[in-house]
Amino acid sequence: MENFEVIKALFLGFVEGLTEFLPISSTGHLILFGHIIDFHSDGGRVFEVVIQLGAILAVCWLYRQKIINLIKGFFSGDVESRHFAISVLIAFSPAVIIGVLAVDFIKSVLFSPIVVAIALIVGALIIFWVESKQFEHKTDDATKITFKQALLVGLAQCVAMIPGTSRSGATIVGGMFAGLSRKAATEFSFFLAMPTMLGAATFDLIKNADVLTSDNMVNIGVGFVAAFIAALLVVKALVLFVERHTLRVFAWYRIVLGVIILIAAMFFNLSA
């Protein structure tokens, strides 16, 4: 049975890695598939946090050279590097403030399958709306984002604290609304994910460190590696995809997933 739980952890790790950076809500997928395969981890919330950490580290690895260049440029006084670093900080700040104030409310009240399903469907409608508008894309390079655009993306990210919204979905759509091209919005979403998810993961790991035991470390480790590998496959593919296609296919997928979760919650006792 323990080996079977490891296989389940491997599967959910891949699910996390495949869905974290797509605008389709990794939370919704983990709730649904975790219920379907009846996965139980003594690590609970820590398992989810660590596999999310695996996904974000994949982005750090893929963009490592750009990150290194930005850091070097920042400390050497390069204006563009400093501008971009400040832009990420501006976008990151609203999530820090709202997250600290609302974390208990979000986890105790909003974290339910019904909320996730509704957020998936509403998010899909917003994607359809944004894609139907002809916004003037003033910025085609993520590193050229303005401070105003960064703030708008940061505020959009706060909406993603509602489970099922999708952090990547909110920030990509928010970026497009602010005047970024689809590709620039996607790449800025990746960079914003780094401090946001690393910060959230660190906070949750410290808060739940007592549940990390030798009994659940294998499941957590397997899930981490699976999420890392899956995210490596998705990130570059997503950038190539959004250069040529709209986000409408993800919107349709969100509606289907939202309806499935609603049905499962009402008739099959699906729980978060």
From Swiss-Prot:
Organism: Acinetobacter baumannii (strain AYE)
Any one of the GO CC terms: plasma membrane
Additional record remark: Bacitracin is thought to be involved in the inhibition of peptidoglycan synthesis by sequestering undecaprenyl diphosphate, thereby reducing the pool of lipid carrier available.
Enzyme Commission (EC) number: 3.6.1.27
Entry superkingdom: Bacteria
UniProt-recorded Gene Ontology molecular function terms: undecaprenyl-diphosphatase activity
Family statement: Belongs to the UppP family.
Name recorded for this polypeptide: Undecaprenyl-diphosphatase
Gene Ontology BP terms: cell wall organization; peptidoglycan biosynthetic process; regulation of cell shape; response to antibiotic
Gene that this polypeptide is encoded by: uppP
